[in-house]
Amino acid sequence: MSDLTTIARPYAKAAFDFAVEKQQLGHWSQMLAFTAEVAKNEQMHELLTSSGSANKLAEIFIAVCGEQLDGHGQNLIKVMAENGRLLAIPALYEHFAVLKQEHEKKVDVEVISATELSEQQRSEIGSKLEQRLERKVQLNCSVDETLLGGVIIRAGDLVIDNSARGRLKRLSDALQS
């Protein structure tokens, strides 16, 4: 999968730069999200891995997407088909979404807690993270009762483990060393 990510990066960057230039970031995001779902479809995946001609594959892919693709989106599909890169479309969308979030100064944050967080707790966590990360934060909260207490917060590469389970593990590691 990392190969597809590497392949997708320049396409995602080009699509992102074009979308920013044309002030169509939302439109391109929706269009690429749709194409990623089409590419993930089992039957489409089988077709894309077949040895069909690039033009035929692009034609079929564009036909399946229908009006969800504008002319520029169709051109992207044609170029990717010519280069044998249609399987990288889901990775292209993922990278595009990351670029979009960076551009909009937003970040998705996963908050895992031992119990359901109150609205006040969510608000406090959100505001503290916005200050620390200097970005608009979108919290995605879930409950994992095995934490015993506390929370684990993941925002990109940042991981804050303030769970009772995490603290017990760190204590155990310290005692064993």
UniProtKB/Swiss-Prot annotation:
Its main location: membrane. GO terms for cellular component: plasma membrane; proton-transporting ATP synthase complex. Keywords: ATP synthesis, Cell inner membrane, Cell membrane, CF(1), Hydrogen ion transport, Ion transport, Membrane, Transport. GO terms for biological process: proton motive force-driven ATP synthesis. Pfam families: OSCP. It is a peripheral membrane protein. It is found in: Cell inner membrane. InterPro entries: ATP_synth_OSCP/delta_N_sf (IPR026015), ATPase_OSCP/d_CS (IPR020781), ATPase_OSCP/dsu (IPR000711). One of its GO terms (molecular function) is proton-transporting ATP synthase activity, rotational mechanism. It comes from the Bacteria. F(1)F(0) ATP synthase produces ATP from ADP in the presence of a proton or sodium gradient. F-type ATPases consist of two structural domains, F(1) containing the extramembraneous catalytic core and F(0) containing the membrane proton channel, linked together by a central stalk and a peripheral stalk. During catalysis, ATP synthesis in the catalytic domain of F(1) is coupled via a rotary mechanism of the central stalk subunits to proton translocation. This protein is part of the stalk that links CF(0) to CF(1). It either transmits conformational changes from CF(0) to CF(1) or is implicated in proton conduction. Belongs to the ATPase delta chain family. NCBIfam families: ATP_synt_delta, PRK05758.2-2, PRK05758.2-5. F-type ATPases have 2 components, F(1) - the catalytic core - and F(0) - the membrane proton channel. F(1) has five subunits: alpha(3), beta(3), gamma(1), delta(1), epsilon(1). F(0) has three main subunits: a(1), b(2) and c(10-14). The alpha and beta chains form an alternating ring which encloses part of the gamma chain. F(1) is attached to F(0) by a central stalk formed by the gamma and epsilon chains, while a peripheral stalk is formed by the delta and b chains. This is ATP synthase subunit delta.
